[in-house]
From Swiss-Prot:
Key words of the record: Membrane, Mitochondrion, Mitochondrion outer membrane, Transmembrane, Transmembrane helix
Domain of life: Eukaryota
Membrane-traversing stretches: 118-138
A Pfam family annotated for this UniProt entry: PDZ
Alphabetical list of PROSITE patterns matching this protein: PDZ (PS50106)
Ranges where the PDZ domain occurs: 13-100
Gene Ontology CC annotations of this record: mitochondrial outer membrane; mitochondrion
Positions on the Cytoplasmic side per record topology: 1-117
Protein name: Synaptojanin-2-binding protein
Organism ancestry: Eukaryota, Metazoa, Chordata, Craniata, Vertebrata
Function: Regulates endocytosis of activin type 2 receptor kinases through the Ral/RALBP1-dependent pathway and may be involved in suppression of activin-induced signal transduction.
Assembly and oligomerization: Binds (via the PDZ domain) to isoform 2A of SYNJ2 (via the unique motif in the C-terminus). Interacts (via C-terminus) with RALBP1. Interacts (via PDZ domain) with ACVR2A (via C-terminus) and ACVR2B (via C-terminus). Forms a ternary complex with ACVR2A and RALBP1. Interacts with MAPK12. Interacts with DLL1; enhances DLL1 protein stability, and promotes notch signaling in endothelial cells.
Organism field: Homo sapiens
Gene3D superfamilies reported in the protein's UniProt record: 2.30.42.10
Topology feature Mitochondrial intermembrane, residues: 139-145
Length: 145
């Protein structure tokens, strides 16, 4: 295995209506607080339960927000991005980049520790038991063979 992780990157327009607790998410990033190495973008750090973003369901933690109401978020200080969100109005349009991890390896491959795979002992115990029975039968009946 080469250790490479592949991602499928998609973009989506998400329209939110500001609720009593704002837009319902927190952000990280900016030119002064890089969240991702060599990327000064603005990312969703937390979705607030029952907030506008959670009720909509499309915005996810880790999503990169590219623009707010058509205004690009590139090369902004963190506080400038926060101010942009706070002053965005009641109806807010977000251009968002989702990164989905893509399976790396052959089809049907299970990663180590994957709970949906069959545990190794579930295979080894029956194989060991069958081997023991075969060895016992061979020893018991070898004179008759």
């Amino acid at each position: 295995m080469n250790g490479r992780v592949d991602y499928l990157v998609t973009e989506e327009e998400i329209n939110l209506t500001r609720g009593p607790s704002g837009l319902g998410f927190n952000i990280v990033g900016g030119t002064d607080q890089q969240y991702v190495s060599n990327d000064s973008g603005i990312y969703v750090s937390r979705i607030k339960e029952n907030g506008a973003a959670a009720l909509d369901g499309r915005l996810q933690e880790g999503d990169k927000i590219l623009s707010v109401n058509g205004q690009d978020l590139k090369n902004l200080l963190h506080q400038d991005a926060v101010d942009l969100f706070r002053n965005a109005g009641y109806a807010v349009s977000l251009r968002v980049q989702h990164r989905l991890q893509v399976q790396n390896g052959p089809i049907g491959h299970r990663g180590e520790g994957d709970p949906s795979g069959i545990p190794i002992f579930m295979v080894l115990v029956p194989v060991f038991a069958l081997t023991m029975v075969a060895a016992w039968a061979f020893m018991r009946y070898r004179q008759q063979l």
